[in-house]
Structures are given as structure tokens and as C-alpha cells.
Amino acid sequence: MIGGGVSLNRMYWHDRNREIDLLQTVVKHHPRFAGTPQWFDHDSSFHLEGGDIVNLSGHAVAIGLSSRTESLAIDRLGEGLLWDDGSSITDAYVIEVPQSGNRLHLDAYLSPISGDTFVVDPLLAREARAYHLRRARRRGSVHAEVCNEGLARILGAATGGDPVRLIDFGDSANGPVAFEYGNGAAGILPLAPGNLCVCAENLAANEALVEAGMTVHPVSIQEMTAGFGGPNSLCLPLMREDL
């Protein structure tokens, strides 16, 4: 769910599109979803995956440009989100996703966990390039500009212009925490603000979250990733409550 509507994506691997077929059946036929806008055409030839979509607020979304999500797919999604009358999204931020180990999507590097608090991999904060998408003058078109102000300010603007709290667990390139980042430390499933489902094996990261005032629910990484994906992208909600 994004901005009051749903994105039914085109997966990179053909066999995984059957998962989206099931979701499309639910959205099309279940009365709870009657009239729900659809922002992306599942039959598109351009790939877009849910792990690259991170909701930042009711009016802003981050979209990862990665090996699994193409720029043309982001253009199509941006047009729907920014121009459809049923969408609450006014700003979209495209963030280039680092390619590090087996982490493929934006949600493996960035997780909103409580209002203005985010877990961020220093690799993303340090190296990623970002672009701001807004409505252009001509109806249906999108204006893109490079963001030069850094990730913290981007997230601050997306959540209301106030300073945000960024939590990192140390340098993801070196030291013992490098294993935990590769093991999904920054890919967190928020059950509610400050109430987090995390990979049990990431002991240092989970301790840091507790020290930051979060409630953690450790689950084995084998269980969290049993569907061949990250904990967030495998559990994207079909309904969201306003905060």
C-alpha cells in the first residue's frame, strides 16, 4: 500500500509473478479493496519489486533504483503516485541502492522504525545518490532533480521538515557488525512504531535497538526469509493505519 492505493509489481524473476497474481485476485475481488487505486500495471514489461518501496510518511515515499527495479518502472509508478486524484503522495525520492553481497533492495539498507526514527546502513548514507520526483507543469509528467543535501535531510523533509533520528550499528564494511548487516540487520519489519520484528541472530544490532528505546521481537532468520526475500518485502501490508 502506498498513499491510499496499491502497487502490484512486475517481479524480476518470471516465476515470482505468480505471487502478484494472487494479490491481484484479492485486490480485484475482495470487497474490502473495492475501488482501491492501482499505481502500477502488473503486466508492465518493466521490473519493480516491493523491497525497493519504502513508505516514509503519508505524503512521501522512497523508491530504490536497483538491479531489480528499473528506472522506467519508477517513472510509471511516479506518474501514478503524483498525479492520480486518489493518491496522497506529493513527493517521491529515488535512491540508488548499493550492491553489497546478497542485499538487493532499498529496504535492506533503510527501515523506518518509529515516526522520525530510521535504521540506516552507513554505506547508503555515505554513498547513495538520490533524486526528488515532483509534479511537473504538464499534467501527467514528472520533474526530477538531484538531491545534494544528504540522506538525513531527505528523510527530514519527507517526515515534516524536522530533524530525524538515524540509528546505525557501525561501519558495514569492516568489523563484526559487517556480518550482521549482511544478515539483515537493517532490514526490519515494524509491527507498529517502535515495535520491531528482527532477525534473532543479529545480537549487536538488536541490543542497539533496545538501547534506543525500541521493543524487539527476535525471530530466526531462516523463518524471516523463508519466502526468499527480506522480512519487510515479504510482509508488505495490504492495509495501513494512519499514524
What residue ranges belong to the model's regions?
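The feature marks the mature, well-folded catalytic cores of soluble enzymes
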Residues: 1-243
